[in-house]
Amino acid sequence: MLSALARPAGAALRRSFSTSXQNNAKVAVLGASGGIGQPLSLLLKNSPLVSRLTLYDIAHTPGVAADLSHIETRATVKGYLGPEQLPDCLKGCDVVVIPAGVPRKPGMTRDDLFNTNATIVATLTAACAQHCPDAMICIISNPVNSTIPITAEVFKKHGVYNPNKIFGVTTLDIVRANAFVAELKGLDPARVSVPVIGGHAGKTIIPLISQCTPKVDFPQDQLSTLTGRIQEAGTEVVKAKAGAGSATLSMAYAGARFVFSLVDAMNGKEGVVECSFVKSQETDCPYFSTPLLLGKKGIEKNLGIGKISPFEEKMIAEAIPELKASIKKGEEFVKNMK
């Protein structure tokens, strides 16, 4: 069922660069001047699916917008600077993508970003709840395992919560899993599709290699190494950049892939499947990432975990306590906000 619905990785991204698909999606990027925000905005500007791109940040957005506006694609671009301009940036938006926040430095976990990024996400999502309550909200800001519960609680406070429209963007985990499996097996990565479930940090990232399309087999030691590499791939990039940032280019690609899939589904395209960290009843965790069938109104159907191996079952059991703690931390943050 799942593999039949899942299209090859990156198909939405490639299609968005072709001229056949036409649409009028109005997309906002909050945190558009940052390391992820700039390349993400470039990919969105390059897509015929997007008709209006509004960019928000606390610095440099007029420059980023001016630069992007010279590109010969149809999306109009406008930059907005500072909190007083945020409402105008959000009005009429169909999709809001939030990569805002501080990046990881060597030695930091995603959870170390909590104190700074929790406040940023709570502030930005409160503005979304007020000025574009019906938009699809895509959260990239880490720690996603906590920032999605924060977003949900903020929307509840404003009385506009719709769990089918709030997404934690975990797509980079899938993109990495596809790339690493393809590398090991000598396959074309565009033809590999590995569902990744759970959360978006360390051992909560659970690649379901047993469900990979095409089917692949690894000896247990190689499977354990591959799984560990997928889980710690973000740290691999942080270390390689030696203090100069975290994964920005691959994250921008993954964020764009998710947005294009979402817009495709909103346009009525059928069979669009992406994994995302969302409100869930698949486990006893209130939020969990699984493959989702996307539709015109967001999540059309949660496709669940499916058939998994004992190794994957064990990973889920080990991930759940950490996931629950991160979720609770996010929920408590909003409850304690003044």
Swiss-Prot record:
Q: Note how its activity is modulated.
A: Enzyme activity is enhanced by acetylation.
Keywords, ordered alphabetically? Acetylation, Glycoprotein, Mitochondrion, NAD, Oxidoreductase, Phosphoprotein, Transit peptide, Tricarboxylic acid cycle
Gene Ontology molecular function, alphabetical: L-malate dehydrogenase (NAD+) activity; protein homodimerization activity; protein-folding chaperone binding
Annotated active site: 200
Work out whether the entry's keyword set contains Acetylation: yes
**Transit sequence range:** 1-24
Q: Tell me the residue numbers annotated for binding NAD(+).
A: 31-37, 57, 117, 140-142, 251
N6-succinyllysine: residues carrying this PTM: 78, 91, 185, 203, 215, 239, 269, 296, 301, 307, 314, 324, 328, 335
Q: What broad class describes the main subcellular location of this protein?
A: mitochondrion
EC code(s) of this entry: 1.1.1.37
The PTM entry states: Acetylation is enhanced after treatment either with trichostin A (TCA) or with nicotinamide (NAM) with the appearance of tri- and tetraacetylations. Glucose also increases acetylation.
Gene3D superfamilies linked: Lactate dehydrogenase/glycoside hydrolase, family 4, C-terminal, NAD(P)-binding Rossmann-like Domain
Task: State what protein this is by name.
Answer: Malate dehydrogenase, mitochondrial
